[in-house]
Amino acid sequence: MTAIDFHGVFPAMCTPFHQDGSIDFETLRDDAQRLESAGVDGLVPVGSTGESATLSHDEHIEVVEAVIDAVDDVPVIAGSGSNNTKEALELSRRSAEAGADALLLISPYYNKPEQQGFIDHYTTLADAVDLPQIVYNVPSRTGQNIEPDTAAELASHPNIRAYKAASGDMNQISEIIERTRDEDFAVLSGDDGMTLPMLSVGGTGCISVSANIEPERTCAMVGAALSGDFERAQAIHHELGPLFRAMFVETNPIPVKEAMRIRGYGPAHLRSPLTRLSDEHLDHLRDVLATLETEDLEDEYAEAER
């Protein structure tokens, strides 16, 4: 199994599209290189932020391959989850063959399995594909919560190495961290506004939407917290707070794609049924981004000990 350190910042990448809906691979590669140059610890293509639900299986793997080809040393964690275990297994195997360093596996959605169903699903994938795997719990999207007992049982599998927490429940997240501390197991934030609170109780980093827009600041915040400088981490957290909130005023990735367009990082085109950011939120997003641009702190953040 490939070794990977699940500490730090892992941007959940967007999949850029041309106006006709085809994938803009040139922009995708440029974006991967921009984020790697900013100092992130890994890249996560074809997850929820990457609109994986609208990609064919072949497109899914083509995006993974393009990101891998674009970067030098940064690990690539491919989203390969599904609500169909057989389909998740196919995507996971193909992602591994494409050269992915690890897999991000959203819990089965819509069909709402019971806890034993989660255990069976993830164990099947972990037994079959010899890559580090991240269990992803986001009940607001999937309709079902992965409970702490289930997370703790899954953490004992040698290929299940991390848990992405986006439940919004700090008591639950804290319990999972407590119960897996003796395992070689990482707990990552999947909610930018919860990243610093999670780091304060033993979380190891984040799979972040906002890091697409502010990678240096996000790396500085996480790096400061991991090194014990919570005063600095807190200051950056509050500096980024308006961005964290702006990224979720509408369904992800609608706001982040608009922010990418405003910053000149790529187009805001989305695949149906997602639609462009509404005018009522667009002006506020511009204001948030303009405020962040008033201070040129990139060099300071890039030099922060991480």
Curated annotation (Swiss-Prot):
Q: In which pathway does it act?
A: Amino-acid biosynthesis; L-lysine biosynthesis via DAP pathway; (S)-tetrahydrodipicolinate from L-aspartate: step 3/4
- Site note Part of a proton relay during catalysis applies to S48, Y110
InterPro entries in the record: Aldolase_TIM (IPR013785), DapA (IPR005263), DapA-like (IPR002220), Schiff_base-form_aldolases_CS (IPR020624)
Question: Could you confirm whether the keyword Cytoplasm appears in this record?
Answer: yes
Q: What is its main location?
A: cytoplasm
The entry's pyruvate-binding residues are T49, I207
- Name-wise, this protein is 4-hydroxy-tetrahydrodipicolinate synthase
